Amino acid sequence: MRWPFIIIIVLWGRVHADTNIWSSGTAHSLPKGQWETGLFQPVRYGLNDDQDIALHPFFALKLPNLVFKKTWTQKNSWTIASQHGIYYPTPLLNSITGAGKFKIVAPQFEFPALIGLTNEILATRSIAKGQLTGKAGLLLGLGGGDLDPLSTIDIPLVYPRLAVYYNGWGLRLGSDYVAPIKGRLSGFIDGDMFLFPGSSSALFFETKVLLIWTKSNRLRLMVGYKFTYGEYPFGSHWQVLPPKLPTLPGGWPLIDIQITW
């Protein structure tokens, strides 16, 4: 069950583009009344031309979540926005705790009510033929004061997103660049760093490389890979994702489809 769980988290990522329609992860908000989603993407909706909200329906019952973005201003060719998210992971964590199939946390552990808060500043501008976005954020994990350090899930992508509940707070820094290649094809690369000051597992880095084929202003297909590095309780470790799975040929990439209407 571990690797399917990772794949879901991998694909639950943010892929940026150079228009307000494909604006997830940038400082741009969706136009008013616009919807956007994907196979493994949250559903986003434009409240007005400078505000949107996002909810991941796949996790809505087990991991209630909501993200709000506000585009504030333009300054020196940069578009500036703030993004604020709230997460309640306790139902999901308790559902994978215990003995038996689909359980990945030992049954002696129990997770209390945990609330995650994210607050980020996003800055986006055009550079050369592409678009660059920088981001910096504060992560807060509430309710984790009594968590047993042995209850961590020490696997890529999952651990750095849960570490904030064990450490209480953290920082997230990153940047993304997307640019046209030829015709309908464009390329995307990003880098994200998670820092948890005071923790023995304090540093995590993730980068994603994607090829994007845009069918129209309503549909696009993305394929690529993600690379991770982290300081886990068991030691430093790097990983290419997705990994080789018994049901897939070696080297199979991440695949996602986005639609908007």
What are these regions (language model features)?
Residues 48-50, 73-75, 127-130, 178-184, ...:
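Outer-membrane beta-barrel channels and translocator barrels
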Residues 15-36, 246-252, 258:
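Outer-membrane beta-barrel biogenesis signature
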Residues 41-45, 66-70, 117-125, 138-140, ...:
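Residues on the lipid-exposed face of transmembrane beta-strands in outer-membrane beta-barrel proteins
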